[in-house]
Curated annotation (Swiss-Prot):
Belongs to the class-I aminoacyl-tRNA synthetase family. IleS type 1 subfamily. Monomer. Pfam families: Anticodon_1 (PF08264), tRNA-synt_1 (PF00133). A motif ('HIGH' region) lies at residues 59-69. A motif ('KMSKS' region) lies at residues 595-599. The lineage of its organism: Bacteria, Bacillati, Mycoplasmatota, Mollicutes, Mycoplasmataceae. ATP binds at residue 598. It comes from Mycoplasma mycoides subsp. mycoides SC (strain CCUG 32753 / NCTC 10114 / PG1). It catalyses: tRNA(Ile) + L-isoleucine + ATP = L-isoleucyl-tRNA(Ile) + AMP + diphosphate. Catalyzes the attachment of isoleucine to tRNA(Ile). As IleRS can inadvertently accommodate and process structurally similar amino acids such as valine, to avoid such errors it has two additional distinct tRNA(Ile)-dependent editing activities. One activity is designated as 'pretransfer' editing and involves the hydrolysis of activated Val-AMP. The other activity is designated 'posttransfer' editing and involves deacylation of mischarged Val-tRNA(Ile). This is Isoleucine--tRNA ligase.
């Protein structure tokens, strides 16, 4: 282009930079939102609208956020922002889980000696540390662009929350659901505490697998015979009390070549056991009915002085092992029940740290003080020396681990507090039946987990948590009733939970129970009891937020965790589900599908990511994934997302630049050309689909729809052909103002559909928009009503135009390849329409819309025409002179420089300057 005419073109200008520099701009917007209370102002605007509550599951307040936190909160933020712009009052009250072992451990690692200080002093350090962690995580969530007020949050360590929890405990007690009993439960030596089922994860480990022979005694029928048992926990053998058999299982007495012993095992397992041990030439002497084995005495495989017997066991099968099961009542749930049925007291000589206690000293003093797992070698060696070890090998199998420490747990019989779920199980399952879930299979999964759940172990042997309110006399017998419990909780309401750990028991007892030397319970409530009470606590603090809440949204690891505990607590408290809809998302993995771990070095730090590429890129990644499945993230994926972001940003930048001189009050046009109307129809269709996708939580579809619309409907079509109108026509030209009107609507459409996702970028867009009607922040707006609807005949016609456009583009591409033309504006396009599309001849400005020099509709064609979808096309090169201003080719130019249209525009510019 000649420099002579460059300044006469209306090239749009905007301060909305091509380079995003998100890491520099985003913190400024976050500060702006917080300082100006944008979230609270939006809630105020929405206060009379329908309430929508997405109840935030509390992350644990320990350490920095990981990518899973970012995924979870960003998904919630999408929903909260969308609801607040589409007719709802949707508060986002974020929560934190702040009690329990990890915080105790973190404080201890800071050099604090828990045993050298009072319980209250240690608890105060935990309290201080937890609040510091909450503050740190809140700042990090703020960096990711969450729409919330960080001063309006719930934290499980606050007095009001703890009291809500204790009142729930009281209600459970009043309903007869709370009890204390000696039971085998999951015990974590690494945490030194009981664990609930929800706190268990499974990992593969290698364990010793041993077959052991136990000598039968006092039997004429089974002389010189051993009962075969099998176990992967040799350390439990010192505690063996019984051998259990199945009542419906057939057993056999066998003779093995080169052995002076006979053996008894399940008939169905002879081949498997023989193969595992390495026996050959096994002879079945006779089959034995199970009842004949009941009461049979045997010598303990480790201690000759200990005699035990064979009993029936409900859990014994002939699918694996030997069909005879070693029973140690202190280390297994079924073992405990069988021992109880046979009037045998539980025996569990293992302490809180997993070490053998002096309870074993009479039988085996060598084991006292040893860690249970370290005794396996000693025990198997003794069995071998005593000729009781038939086979030792190692097998890899799935084994329960502590979900926090990632170390193995054991079943251990201890006195614990429980919630009896049997009386409320049907109510719980009925409530599950009434909820909606996303994905659909989630309801069945939650139902199954709750249906199979046994009584809830709610006590923990820790210090940092909500105390269990109970008392004991000098004989350690429990002293508790409704009067005592209510009095104690009322006292704690006055003085706080720390007082439970510092004041005498009498301070919490009614008058008639004082001065009786009663002792307080030392255990605290399970942290799942804490977080599972959150919906109740929130409903009490904010009466306008009524149960059940509209939605819970957490990772798919919460079916056994928060989803589960919340449903139990809410059902017991108010016989209602805490949520109407339950939504779960998958876990984050690297690009190869591997779980993220420090050892693999494949983790993604969301804050480092935001401070490098920008939080909006991370948020766009979240939107792009199918969150119901596991989400992959890595360099290549982020590269693709960044490219998508650039396309969106550049499209918006073009629109902003070309609205720079547009005043919506004076320049907005209601009468538009047909192509403008068609563009607005596509806008409405697109926006409706996006809104539906948001409503269905299909954010990946939102992402796909946006990218298709930006690239195909806007960049490759409408924005492409209107450039000449915007740049070349005069400023106040009607056609130019019509196009700008469409751009104005397109921009607001993009603002609405992208506002929940690209929260910083859309704020930047809005701040750079030339609009006299602007409010303080884009996040105070509701979605703009954009209902551009036209009759079907009109839409069908323009759908056909778009097909013809594709035909022309195909012909142009072939012509470029054949060197007929270089650019589209050189092309003279001759078109023979198929008969049913003849009406397209009447469309105005097709050459401008198709960005070609001219279009001729013809009736006759020859072999040089190319057959396309609805037409036959021939492209020729326009011969003539190129206008130095608009670059279009004409037969004649004024002064051999510019076309007539450009000349008129330039003249009007000169006249305006002179005025």
């Amino acid at each position: 282009m000649s420099n002579k005419y460059k300044d006469t073109l209306l090239i749009g200008k905007t301060d909305f930079d091509m380079r995003a520099n998100l890491n520099q701009k985003e913190p400024k917007f976050e500060q702006f939102w917080q300082e100006n209370q944008i979230y609270n102002k939006k809630l105020k605007l929405n206060e009379n609208k329908k309430v929508f509550v997405l109840h935030d599951g509390p992350p644990y307040a320990n350490g920095d956020l990981h990518i899973g936190h970012a995924l979870n909160k960003t998904l919630k933020d999408f929903i909260i922002r969308f609801k607040n712009t589409t007719g709802y009052y949707a508060p986002f009250i974020m929560g934190w889980d702040t009690h329990g072992l990890p915080i105790e451990s973190a404080v201890t690692k800071m050099g604090v000696d828990r045993k050298s200080m009072s319980s209250v002093a240690f608890r105060e350090l935990c309290y201080k540390y937890a609040l510091e962690q909450v503050s740190n995580q809140a700042n990090q969530f703020n960096r990711l662009g969450m729409f919330t007020d960080y001063d309006t949050k719930y934290v499980t360590l606050t007095h009001d929350f703890e009291m809500s929890e204790l009142r729930l405990f009281e209600k459970m007690y009043q309903k007869g659901l709370i009890y204390k009993d000696l039971k085998p439960i999951y015990w974590s030596p690494s945490s030194e505490s009981a664990l609930a089922d929800s706190e268990i994860i499974y990992k593969d480990i290698s364990s010793p697998s041993i077959y052991v022979g136990c000598d039968v005694i006092n039997s004429d029928e089974f002389k010189n015979t051993q009962l075969i048992i099998w176990t992967t926990t040799p350390w439990t053998l010192p505690s063996n009390q019984l051998i259990a058999i199945g009542s419906k299982i057939k057993y056999s007495l066998i003779q093995v070549e080169n052995s002076d012993k006979q053996f008894i095992l399940a008939s169905d397992l002879i081949n498997q056991v023989s193969q595992n041990i390495g026996w050959e030439n096994v002879k079945v002497i006779k089959e034995i009915d199970a009842n004949k084995l009941v009461g049979l005495n045997y010598v303990h495989p480790l201690y000759d002085t200990k005699i035990s017997k064979v009993v029936l066991g409900h859990h014994v099968t002939s699918e694996s092992g030997s069909g005879l099961v070693h029973i140690a009542s202190g280390f297994g749930e079924d073992d405990f029940l069988i021992a109880k049925q046979n009037n045998i007291k539980p025996f569990a000589p293992i302490d809180n740290q997993g070490k053998f206690t002096t309870q074993i000293s009479d039988l085996d003093p060598q084991l006292v003080g040893m860690f249970y797992d370290d005794t396996n070698k000693i025990i198997t060696k003794r069995l071998e020396e005593n000729k009781k070890l038939l086979k030792l090998k190692f097998l890899t199998h799935s084994y329960p681990h502590d979900w926090r420490t990632k170390k193995p747990v054991i079943y251990r019989c201890t006195l614990q507090w429980f919630v009896n779920l049997a009386p409320v199980k049907n109510d719980i399952l009925k409530n599950v039946d009434q909820i909606n879930t996303h994905p659909k299979w989630a309801k069945k999964r939650l139902y199954q987990v709750l249906d199979e759940r046994t009584d809830w172990t709610i006590s923990r042997q820790r210090l940092w948590g909500v105390p269990i309110i109970a008392f004991y006399d000098q004989n350690d017998d429990l002293v508790l009733n409704e009067q005592i419990l209510n009095y104690a909780i009322n006292k704690i309401e006055e003085v706080g939970t720390n007082a439970w750990f510092s004041l005498d028991a009498d301070e919490f007892l009614p008058e008639q129970y004082k001065n009786k030397s009663l002792k307080k319970e030392k255990d605290i409530l399970d942290v799942w009891f804490d977080s599972g009470s959150s919906a109740i606590a929130l409903s009490q603090k904010y009466p306008n937020l009524k149960l059940p809440y509209d939605m819970y949204l957490e990772g798919n690891d919460q079916y056994r965790g928060w989803f589960n505990a919340s449903m139990i607590n809410s059902t017991i408290y108010s016989n209602t589900s805490p949520y109407k809809q339950l939504v779960s998302h998958g876990m984050t993995t690297d690009e190869k599908g591997n779980k993220m771990s420090k050892s693999l070095g494949n983790g993604v730090d969301p804050i480092a990511f935001a401070n490098d590429l920008g939080a909006d890129i991370l948020r766009l990644w979240v939107a792009s994934t199918d969150f119901t499945d596991d989400q992959k993230i890595g360099k290549e994926i982020i590269k693709q997302i960044s490219e998508s972001y650039r396309k969106i940003r550049n499209t918006i930048r073009f629109i902003l630049a070309n609205l720079n001189d547009f005043n919506v009050k004076t320049d907005y046009q209601t009468k538009l050309s047909e192509v403008d109307m068609y563009s607005l129809f596509n806008l409405t269709s697109f926006k409706n689909k996006v809104i539906q996708a948001y409503q269905e939580l299909n954010f990946s579809l939102v992402y796909t729809l946006v990218m298709n619309y930006v690239t195909k409907n806007l960049s490759a079509f409408y924005l492409d052909f209107i450039k000449d109108i915007l740049y070349i026509n005069s400023k106040n030209d009607l056609r130019r103002r019509q196009v700008q009107t469409v751009l104005y609507e397109q921009l607001y459409c993009l603002i609405d559909v992208l506002r929940p996702i690209l929260v910083h970028t859309i704020e930047e867009v809005y701040q750079n928009l030339n609009d006299n009607n602007k409010v303080e922040s884009v996040h105070l707006l509701d979605n703009k009503e954009q209902n551009f609807v036209y009759d079907k005949e009109f839409i069908n016609k323009w759908d056909q135009v778009m097909i013809l456009r594709d035909d022309v583009n195909k012909a142009l591409e072939i012509s470029r390849e054949n060197k007929i033309i270089n650019k589209g504006f050189e092309a003279v396009v001759n078109i023979k329409l198929d008969k049913e599309y003849d009406d397209l001849k009447n469309i105005k400005d097709l050459s401008q819309i198709f960005i070609v020099n001219s279009i001729n509709f013809v009736d006759n064609i020859d072999n040089s025409f190319i057959k396309t979808n609805i037409s036959s096309i021939k492209v020729e090169q326009k011969q003539g002179l190129k206008c130095q201003r608009c670059w279009q080719i004409f037969d004649n130019l004024i002064d051999d420089e510019i076309c007539n249209h450009c000349n008129n525009v330039v003249k009007s510019l000169l006249e305006t300057k002179c005025e």
